[in-house]
Amino acid sequence: MNPETLKFIEASIKTIPDYPKPGILFRDITSLIENADAFKATIDLLANHYRDQGITKIVGTEARGFIFGAPVAYAMGLGFVPVRKPGKLPRAVIEESYALEYGTDTLQLHTDAIVPGDKVLVVDDLLATGGTVDATVKLIRRAGGEVVDAAFIISLPSLGGDARLTAAGVKVVSLVELPGE
């Protein structure tokens, strides 16, 4: 990946201190997607990086994974598969629950969206603890798909998501790594 393009992408991400609460450094990707050149560079970089890797589907997690996953799928001429919270998908689904700081949450995938043999790229905006993408990977594998990589615009390695996904056998690719709280 082109280092100058990566620096341009990183520079387009604003950091908001003490949001949503004191002590948090919020990484705001809306500043990236508001900038047409930065948004295009991000999509092109991911699509070009994965174009010749035999990927058959792009999966994005609700909701910001849709922002990046769908245009990457379009640029690669592939289908896009949304993984959503319960009650948002109209056909038969499989689901996976995962732990949150206080409680649990659940994600769902249409049962016919991934078929055995699909080679899948998971795309999301930010990797923190890895819980959402870990649950997404489990759904894809249960459906018979192979997760090639999980790609993120931003990774906060200090929060453990990189290690969690690597331990689950998932290669993590991040365009920008930042310290995280």
Swiss-Prot record:
Gene3D superfamilies: 3.40.50.2020. It catalyses: AMP + diphosphate = 5-phospho-alpha-D-ribose 1-diphosphate + adenine. Its main location: cytoplasm. Its EC number is 2.4.2.7. Pathway: Purine metabolism; AMP biosynthesis via salvage pathway; AMP from adenine: step 1/1. Signal peptide: none annotated. One of its GO terms (cellular component) is cytosol. Keywords: Cytoplasm, Glycosyltransferase, Purine salvage, Transferase. It comes from the Bacteria. CDD domains: PRTases_typeI. It is an enzyme of class 2 (transferase). GO terms for molecular function: adenine phosphoribosyltransferase activity. One of its GO terms (biological process) is purine ribonucleoside salvage. It is found in: Cytoplasm. PANTHER family: ADENINE PHOSPHORIBOSYLTRANSFERASE (PTHR11776), PHOSPHORIBOSYLTRANSFERASE DOMAIN-CONTAINING PROTEIN (PTHR11776:SF7). Catalyzes a salvage reaction resulting in the formation of AMP, that is energically less costly than de novo synthesis. Belongs to the purine/pyrimidine phosphoribosyltransferase family. Homodimer. This is Adenine phosphoribosyltransferase.
